[in-house]
């Protein structure tokens, strides 16, 4: 007897006629006048559930089988057989059903066999993976995670785990969560009245990281090609469907690379991810296309087959100014592009993914390399139809004197970044990298409208349940 997953049965890995054991949860139960019950069982291994044909002669048929409701946990032993009904290829002809866990009160069980609003499901995030949508999102998220590591491994990158607790603000924006063990009721004070962090756990002021980039740069300047993939945190009091306080970031870093090489890798990377998810999660994407976003599959296929357009920020501004469209946000050289501008460029004007390069220096981070014009930095944003910016990257400033100037412009204390400055003192080379918010990627692939549905337990202002 083989313990088999539903995925193994539907993919042909289990031979028809085999005696199998399947373990999972009841989706639905339907009783027949012919003295049978049809129990749909899902184990989460794929989108489909398998139908279990349960005869009335089973010893627990009346006492247990006919009382099964959505969410009950069962172990089924039976024979895998061709299905006589419509809608699926195989079924299990049950020899026994063991009820492992009952749903205490089926009437109040939150995940009923009906469509629930996404707002409601966020309130029961611990149970929402049992729904069709969030089961699909979880499997797609897993597939994309594995594809990230596979792409970099196959292309000679090393995975570096960067710290979550840090003393540095990698973006220079100041929107950071403080980490402290100090007694908030009785804070130690300095002579000037400030908080004396020398009494804190680390002996200095520390935060949750907003990016692993600064740390991973150190390893790029020794191992040539590296990446980090881990949680990051932003204390940005934003309640939009595009922002989370805790999310995962993918950040490769490449030594001896310029902005053009950075953009080339970003294009290869995204196309690899989308190709992989189309190949490996076709069942989940079929459901997404049917129920969430009709164009999901064609959108991803179009992305893979389209060469990315390259355009400079200055030229993008000119196109937007000449578009004749009235935007909600102003279009002016020196202002950052908003989502509506990005989507007009990639959807209405160019019709495919776009890489916008060379942004004004004052709207980008301090570590980006100043161009020869003295006004722009070697930065890029990859814009995708349907979402706008999906990747942000740059060539890093490898010249110590220029880095110091940029840090002064941002009001950053060089003493806090002495270790980062050391990279420019000891064998500095041109290098580049980019960042991709993993949840934004999941949103794009799954056609979701709210990023809080792209992560198992969303953290946002006023929301840290579970």
From Swiss-Prot:
InterPro entries from the UniProt entry: Aa-tRNA-synt_II, aa-tRNA-synth_II, aa-tRNA-synth_II/BPL/LPL, Asn-tRNA-ligase, Asp/Asn-tRNA-synth_IIb, NA-bd_OB-fold, NA-bd_OB_tRNA
Catalyzed reactions per annotation: tRNA(Asn) + L-asparagine + ATP = L-asparaginyl-tRNA(Asn) + AMP + diphosphate + H(+)
PROSITE patterns: AA_TRNA_LIGASE_II
EC number: 6.1.1.22
Biological process, per Gene Ontology: asparaginyl-tRNA aminoacylation
SUPFAM superfamilies: Class II aaRS and biotin synthetases, Nucleic acid-binding proteins
A GO-annotated cellular component: cytoplasm
A Pfam cross-reference name: tRNA-synt_2
TM stretches of this protein: none
Keywords: Aminoacyl-tRNA synthetase, ATP-binding, Cytoplasm, Ligase, Nucleotide-binding, Protein biosynthesis
Molecular function GO labels: asparagine-tRNA ligase activity; ATP binding; nucleic acid binding
Localization (cell): Cytoplasm
Family: Belongs to the class-II aminoacyl-tRNA synthetase family.
Quaternary assembly: Homodimer.
Protein name, as recorded: Asparagine--tRNA ligase
């Amino acid at each position: 007897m083989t313990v088999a997953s539903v995925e193994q049965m539907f993919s042909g890995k289990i031979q028809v006629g085999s005696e199998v054991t399947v373990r999972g949860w009841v989706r639905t139960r339907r009783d027949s006048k012919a003295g049978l019950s049809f129990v749909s069982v899902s184990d989460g291994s794929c989108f489909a559930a398998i139908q279990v044909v349960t005869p009335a002669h089973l010893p627990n048929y009346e006492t247990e089988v006919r009382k099964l409701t959505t969410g009950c946990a069962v172990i089924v032993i039976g024979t895998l057989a061709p299905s006589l009904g419509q809608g699926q290829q195989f079924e299990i002809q049950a020899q026994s059903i063991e009820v492992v866990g009952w749903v205490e009160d089926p009437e109040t069980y939150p995940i009923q066999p009906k469509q629930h609003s996404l707002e409601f499901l966020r309130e029961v995030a611990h149970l929402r993976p049992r729904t069709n949508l969030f089961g699909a999102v979880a499997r797609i998220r897993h597939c994309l995670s594995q594809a990230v590591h596979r792409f970099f491994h196959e292309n000679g990158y090393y995975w570096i785990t960067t710290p979550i607790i840090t003393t540095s603000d990698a973006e220079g924006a100041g929107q950071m969560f403080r980490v402290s063990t100090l007694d908030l009721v009785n804070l130690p004070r300095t002579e000037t009245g400030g908080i004396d962090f020398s009494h804190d756990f680390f002996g200095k002021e520390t935060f949750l990281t907003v990016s692993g980039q600064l740390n991973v740069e150190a390893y790029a300047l020794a191992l040539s090609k590296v990446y980090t993939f881990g949680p990051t945190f932003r204390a940005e009091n934003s309640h939009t469907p595009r922002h989370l306080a805790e999310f995962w970031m993918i950040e490769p870093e490449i030594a001896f690379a310029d902005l053009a090489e950075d953009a080339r890798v970003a294009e290869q990377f995204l196309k690899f991810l989308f190709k992989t998810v189309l190949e490996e999660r076709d069942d989940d994407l079929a459901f997404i296309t049917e129920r969430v976003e009709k164009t999901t599959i064609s959108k991803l296929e179009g992305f893979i087959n389209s060469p990315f357009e390259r355009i400079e920020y200055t030229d993008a501004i000119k196109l937007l100014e000449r578009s004749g469209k009235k935007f909600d946000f102003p279009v002016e050289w020196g202002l950052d592009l908003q989502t509506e501008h990005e989507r007009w460029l990639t959807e209405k004007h160019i019709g495919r993914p776009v890489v916008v390069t060379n942004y004004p220096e004052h709207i980008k981070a301090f570590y980006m390399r100043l161009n020869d014009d003295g006004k722009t930095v070697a930065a890029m944003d990859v814009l995708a139809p349907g979402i706008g910016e999906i990747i942000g990257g740059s060539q890093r400033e490898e010249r110590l004197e220029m880095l110091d100037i940029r840090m002064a412009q941002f009001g950053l204390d060089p003493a806090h970044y002495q270790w980062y400055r050391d990279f420019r003192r000891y064998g500095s080379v041109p290098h580049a990298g980019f960042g991709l918010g993993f949840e934004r990627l999941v949103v794009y692939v799954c056609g979701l409208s709210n990023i809080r549905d792209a992560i198992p337990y969303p953290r946002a202002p006023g929301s840290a349940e579970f």
